[in-house]
Structures are given as C-alpha cells and as structure tokens.
Amino acid sequence: MVADFFKKEHGFTMIELTAVLILAGIIAAAAASVLSRQHANLRGRAGALESHIRYARALAMSTDEDNWGIRFDIESDQYWLFYCQTGQTCGWDDNKTRIPGTKQKTVDLKEYKLGISSTSHGGNTVTLAFDNFGTPYWAEADEVLENRLEKSFTATLSDNSANTRDIKVIPETGAVP
C-alpha cells in the first residue's frame, strides 16, 4: 500500500493548469472591461468639452465677433458656446450658439450622468472667453470680460462614482493641453 502511494503521481496535469489560466484570463478581461466602461463616459465628455473650448478659441481668432467663449453654470451642470462684444456685459441667453455636433444650444451634463464640480475661477457661473488673438479671459456672474487669464483655468467634471477629470486652459496662449 505504501508502495502504491509513491507510484501515483500527485499534482496537476498541463491541461488542468492551462484550463485554469484561460478561465482566470477571461474573468480578468471581463472585470477590466466593466471598470473601463465606467470611466469612458467621463473621459469622452471631458474630451468633448476640451474640443468645445478649442472651437470657441478658433472662432474668436477667425471671425469678426470680439469674443467667443464657453459659459459654465455649475449649479445646473451646463455649459454653452457664446459670442459677445469686448467691454460689454453679455446677454448670455441671447448670444448662445449651438456647438456643432450637439442638438441644443446648451450642453446639459446631467444627461450623461456627469456634473461640473468646480472651476478654478469664480463661483457658480463662470465664463471663459477668447479674444481675436486667442488670449483667454474669464469673468464671474455677469461681469464684463476684462480679466485676462493669469493662471491656468481648470474646470473639473465628475461622475456619480466621485471620479473626476480636469480640463485645463493655459494662460497667454489659451491652449488646451
């Protein structure tokens, strides 16, 4: 009986090891895809906002309007594209312009289960605007657009899982990295 115990081979066959590794790989791939989908919406909308800011800057440099920009309403989690004259308080509702690729003049981030959690400048309503040279300006509430951006402007988007994504605008150039 003792001799029979030592004759039997104990352990796993190569087929068993391969099957376990394949199953572990499938489970890991499924878990990774679920986790990446949760962040895809936030990354996608942050990329869209970056494009919308770049578009506003391009319009400011290529049209006869004095200023083009993006207006952020943090309380309602919305933003929109606008134009207005330098040195004047803008009529935000009158000067809204539909962003290409959107159906409405206002982008409502709640539709995407996202929100604007903060901006680096100002309070509940903040404006980021560009002049015809692409120089960025900012204003709070309904102020006149006369404040040149002296430090980076940051808008923070967040989702329901407390994940965040920062969108930055560089002072002087207005570039969005």
Regions found by a protein language model. Name each.
Residues 67-133, 166, 177:
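Type IV pilin-like appendage domain
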Residues 40-69:
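Membrane-proximal N-terminal amphipathic helix
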Residues 135-137, 154-177:
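Low-complexity, S/T/G/P-rich flexible repeat/linker segments used as non-globular hinges
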Residues 2-35:
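N-terminal single-pass transmembrane signal-anchor helix
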Residues 14-15, 32, 36-44, 50, ...:
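Polybasic/polar functional segments that serve as interface/processing modules
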Residues 84-99, 138-156:
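Surface-exposed intrinsically disordered loops and tails
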Residues 112-114, 119, 134-136, 143, ...:
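Small-residue (G/S/T/A) turn/hinge positions that recur once per unit in extracellular repeat modules
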